Regions:
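Short, glycine-/small- and polar/acidic-enriched structural segments
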Residues: 20-205, 213-250, 402
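Soluble non-cytosolic domains of exported or imported proteins
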Residues: 36, 63-67, 82, 163-168, ...
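Gram-negative bacterial Sec-dependent N-terminal signal peptides
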Residues: 1-19
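N-terminal hydrophobic or amphipathic helices and topogenic motifs
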Residues: 20-59, 141-159, 326-451
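Pocket-lining segment of extracytoplasmic ligand-binding domains
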Residues: 118, 207-320
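Repeat-unit-sized solenoid/scaffold elements
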Residues: 178-208, 236-254, 336-337, 343, ...
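Short alpha-helical interface patches
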Residues: 118-127, 262, 381-389
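Secondary-structure end/capping motifs
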Residues: 264-382
């Protein structure tokens, strides 16, 4: 047992009921976030007093983009932040920024979608099965493939946006395209555009700028979280064609990230933060999402997401609008606690690493053990379990809410749009089972894939 684990365990075992975490090393904290619906656990932990209950005084500060947010955490300007799941993983292996980051808490499942412009949607529609005058969902990228081919024949690039190179959005967009037989391109150490050999050109656009960039014609579609897909519908400029829950059911999305240095220096503060965030997640998913309407009003405020409440409510309250008049039930579009959403599973980290390898961000093949070791260096379920045990001891949660028997790996799943089975304990076999993308010992040299 590490010194940190021993210290946290002694604290958890000694906590009286209804007591804040004792021995807080740092009471005043500044946490960063991006203006997205899935920052909700942070806003709720603050507004419902869960941070305060733990003896924490928290200031939440919106960041302009994911790079600024990451730099803020690494520099210490921010004590922690709402992060893309891929950010602490990529930092740990030195892809982009090199830093030792960890996460004790997964912030949500699902929550993203892929939107295309109205013009592209009209070109896709003849290829989409219909029932009762409405598209049959999920819509596969097969329907987009002939559109992209027509653009290529005309010599016109097909530009798509995503929020960050190591974002779930990037990997979901690429997965969806590849499942439809479209090569999204690969990265190499010498070319980090991710466009080598691609039939589309995928680039970065900050989430709040997605609708305006689409409207300007700079991009023809994008993958992003809410409320920026529903905003395209509200503005009449685009059509979401698929949610990420239909690409991978109950996929991990954001995490709460901290530096390993912060956690080592502030173990009780880290425990307190994790407890408060778990309570916020429980509140968000309580009952049949009974608190979501209140959450929407909080998120709509300018200091948080700052979008129209009706737009945020489209996804947060159990529905999703694909086109005007085509609003469908989507009770699990945003999941904050159920299905063990907050548990930091190693297998979630491993999946991200497999996609980094698939698309060349990890330039060379790695053994299965490397994936396991890397995941365990970043994801910290031991802290999460201690926070959960403390909440149970305080009467703020019950044991049946948590997966205490988990070894850190979810069961293998085939809940992907292409039906391919993912087993986090066999990452190389999984990579090799995917038709498009690097596999085995393949590398990218001089813009060419070599064996």
């Amino acid at each position: 047992m590490t010194r940190l684990s021993a210290l946290l365990l002694s604290t958890a075992l000694c906590l009286p009921a209804h007591a804040q975490t004792p021995g807080i090393e740092k009471e005043e904290l500044t946490l960063g976030f991006i203006k997205l619906t899935d920052m909700a656990p942070l806003a709720i932990a603050k507004e419902k007093g869960f941070f305060e209950d733990e003896g924490l005084s928290v200031t939440l500060v919106a960041q302009s983009n994911w790079k600024v947010l990451l730099d803020g955490v690494v520099s210490g300007e921010l004590d922690g932040a709402h992060m893309l799941a891929g950010q602490p993983i990529a930092a740990s292996i030195g892809y982009g920024t090199k830093a030792a980051l960890v996460t004790p808490f997964s912030m949500d499942l699902n929550g993203n979608a892929i939107t295309v412009s109205n013009a592209v949607w009209e070109e896709m529609k003849p290829n989409v099965p219909m029932a009762d005058g409405k598209p049959v969902h999920p819509i596969k990228a097969d329907a987009l493939k002939p559109v992209i081919e027509a653009y290529a024949d005309a010599g016109t690039p097909f530009n798509l946006g995503m929020v960050f190179p190591v974002s779930t959005h990037n990997y979901e967009l690429r997965y969806w395209l590849a499942a439809g037989g479209i090569n999204p391109g690969v990265y190499s150490p010498d070319d980090v555009s991710g466009q080598i050999g691609g039939e589309v050109l995928i680039s970065v656009t900050p989430p709040p700028q997605m609708p305006a960039t689409l409207e300007a014609g700079t991009i023809l579609g994008y993958a992003v979280g809410e409320p920026w897909n529903q905003a395209a519908v509200a503005k009449g400029i685009g059509v979401p064609v698929i949610t990420d829950a239909d690409i991978w059911k109950n996929n991990p999305e954001k995490v709460f990230g901290l530096t390993a240095e912060f956690v080592d220096a502030n173990p009780q503060t880290t425990l307190a933060l994790t407890k408060a965030l778990i309570r916020a997640a429980i509140w968000l998913d309580e009952g049949d999402n009974v608190n979501r309407a209140e959450a929407v009003e909080i998120l709509a405020r300018s200091e948080y997401v700052g979008a129209d409440a009706a737009v945020i409510a489209n996804s947060m309250t159990g529905t999703f609008e694909f086109e005007p008049g085509d609003k469908r039930p989507a009770p699990d579009f945003n999941v904050f606690f159920r299905y063990n959403a907050t548990f930091p599973y190693y297998s979630d980290a491993v999946w991200t690493l497999t996609q980094m390898r698939r698309w060349g961000q990890i330039a060379e093949a790695k053994p299965d053990a490397w994936y396991d070791e890397t995941a365990k260096s970043v994801y910290k379920p031991d802290i999460y379990k201690l926070a959960a045990e403390a909440l149970i001891a305080e009467g703020k949660a019950t044991a049946d809410m948590f997966d205490f028997d988990a070894d850190g790996y979810r069961e293998p799943t085939s809940d992907f749009i292409d039906g391919v089975t993912y087993d986090g304990k066999a990452p190389n076999a999984y990579i090799d089972s995917l038709v498009i993308g690097l596999k085995g010992d393949q590398t990218v040299v001089g813009g060419e894939v070599t064996n």
